Amino acid sequence: MSTDIFSICAKCLGDESRIKMIKQVNGDECRQCTRPYTIYRWGNRKQGNKTIICITCARARHCCQSCLLDITYGIPTDLRDTALEMAGLEPLTKSANPTNREVKAIMADKLETKFKEQQERSNDILSKLAEKLNKPEEKKTEVAIDVAKLAKKLPFGNSLDVQKYPDMTTFFVFGFSSDFPQAIFSRYAEQYGKVESVVFSSVSGCGFIRFEKVSSAVGFAKSIAENGLNKNKSIAGLLILENTPMRVCFGKQKPLPRTAADQRKLNTVVTKVMKQLASKSKVGVVVKTKPNVYKALSEDYEE
């Protein structure tokens, strides 16, 4: 199959010698650039797979169109770029967040060229990183425990109180659906100032956004807190974009799960917390409970 048509990793394609693919021209909007793109679907009905970003964005990020992992090494692109940055190389996907679709396409082409130029220098670093990350898991129980601990460390209990977090520029965003385009959230945030980074996990249903300036973060926080949907100011603020509800609060950035299984487990926690916050928001007053404590974050979060 020609790489001129799509960019899909071997793991997503599976072990079948023959794969039947369904092609749908302009079937959806790319989650990265929001331009219409050709969707490819394959697999059976129970475990069907599909591409979720366009070929231009996939080539620019050097990632799989389905799982969004690095197409060569099978590692998360944000982790890959961090490793390259620490080694003195320019991250492959670190760029501004333009709103114009044509500009995004041009920038995607430039990112693809940049990757080719520094590919030889980065191969050694990424090979070693991939070797460590892709080792078979020895104890699945240990992974589950780590996910539970991570869920407890995520700032679900924080708010949008700018006086409580005067110098913070990072926000925790959670509760959005798996098909919600990151680009829509980025466009909304960019109204309040330059965004330094956006890290979303579609499967987990949560992520982080960081502004360059405190003034931008303050404007962003107030816009959500005062949008008429948030009577209870002591909890994460409710934001609705494109009919998709989500919660936003101040919070330090934490690493999110890398495997699909762990991401689904974290999504279970996110769903439970969203329901609990919905009941609290109806009260409209400060609820007398311990901060940052939710039933969904208990050890039996997998239920």
From Swiss-Prot:
- Specify whether RNA-binding is a keyword of the entry: yes
Q: Name one Pfam family in it.
A: STL11_N
* Keywords per UniProt: mRNA processing, mRNA splicing, Nucleus, RNA-binding, Spliceosome
Q: Does the keyword Lipoprotein apply?
A: no
As one GO molecular function, the record gives:
U6 snRNA binding
SUPFAM superfamilies cross-referenced by the UniProt entry: RNA-binding domain, RBD (SSF54928)
- Top-level taxon of origin: Eukaryota
A GO BP term here is: mRNA processing
Residue ranges annotated as coiled coil are none
Q: Where in the cell is it found?
A: Nucleus
InterPro entries, per this entry? Cwc2/Slt11 (IPR039171), Nucleotide-bd_a/b_plait_sf (IPR012677), RBD_domain_sf (IPR035979), Slt11_RRM (IPR034356), STL11/RBM22-like_N (IPR048995)
Gene Ontology CC entries for this record: Prp19 complex; U2-type catalytic step 1 spliceosome; U2-type catalytic step 2 spliceosome
Tell me, in a sentence or two, what this protein's role is: Involved in pre-mRNA splicing. Facilitates the cooperative formation of U2/U6 helix II in association with stem II in the spliceosome. Binds to RNA.
Q: How does it assemble?
A: Associated with the spliceosome.
State the family it belongs to: Belongs to the SLT11 family.
What's the name of the protein? Answer: Pre-mRNA-splicing factor SLT11
User: Where does this protein come from, organism-wise?
Assistant: Candida albicans (strain SC5314 / ATCC MYA-2876) (Yeast)
User: What is the taxonomic lineage of the source species?
Assistant: Eukaryota, Fungi, Dikarya, Ascomycota, Saccharomycotina
